Amino acid sequence: MGKSQSRRDLFKLGGLGAAAGVVSSIGAGGLSLLSPQQAYAQAAPTSLLRTVLDRKKLIVGTGSTNAPWHFEDEKGQLVGMDITMARILSQGLFDDPNKVEFVKQDPAARIPNITTGKVDIVIQFMTVTAQRAQLVAFTRPYYLEGVALLISVKGKHKNYKALQTAGKSVRVSVLQNVYADQIVHAALPQAQVMQLDTEANAIQAVDSGRADAAAIDLSTVRWLVKRNPNAYIDAGYSYYPQIYSAAVRHGDQDWLNWVNTAFTVAMFATEGELYDKGLEDYFGLKPPVRKPGFPPI
């Protein structure tokens, strides 16, 4: 029996109403709880929740080349925060984080693979937009991405305030796109903009000293600082928030509700071991303090 299952059983034994478990009936015999079989029967016959439980594995569409979200480690195993979120679902379904089949896909395949049923869910650093929500159903957010400024330990500017003070003398590298100037100037209005063809080259410009800072994803900044604290610094300013969520097929409320519940429990309640480890491993962040009372969600 897994640690999370033991915790669930402990709460059940408490017999304290809704906080102790899901009450199925109150009669002469007192409180009774839904068995796994009864809980299973509550899902609609056509729900993917039933299909996944019957199949005994979860099929997840994701990528394999974008740290810290989804990438292969030195052993060739998929790791990253997206992979962690998938394992959280597997843990909730089967009390085993490893009953997952990962389908590696390009970002362009995320929506088609959901709508055609090739995968049960896509967890692949997917930005939520109103347009995409017409095609797939988004889960509750699990990350708020943004733009941040990466600077070198060897650079002359050590934080965001120093970059601001330097004014026109600051050079900022950024991935080439139509909004590049706008992205940089939103944080540093007077900075010189150096557009480069890849994010890797934008980072390399900081390494070589050609740029004082790189305007890149906040998650990438955190990942690089976590891995190379002697090389990089987070300047301490982030902006342009974008929501990351998982995506499922439209029309299956039971499946969507279950995924949302599993994510919420991992992020805010008693079963956060996997989520907390992901925060530390991939972002260098301390796990959130979970305090009883009104939820911060």
Task: Briefly describe each language-model feature range.
Residues 109, 125-135, 185-186, 207-241:
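A ligand-binding cleft/hinge motif common to bilobed small-molecule-binding domains
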Residues 43, 92, 154-155, 169-170, ...:
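Extended ligand-binding regions for polar small-molecule ligands
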Residues 64, 143-154, 218-263, 283-297:
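Periplasmic-binding protein-like
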Residues 1-21, 29:
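N-terminal secretory signal peptides and thylakoid transit peptides that target proteins
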Residues 28-55:
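C-terminal segment of N-terminal export signals and the immediately downstream linker at the start
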Residues 87, 91, 99-164:
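Acidic, polar ligand-binding/catalytic clefts
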Residues 57-81:
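Short glycine-rich His-centered loop
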Residues 100-112, 194-204, 242:
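Short helix-initiation/N-cap motifs at beta->coil->alpha
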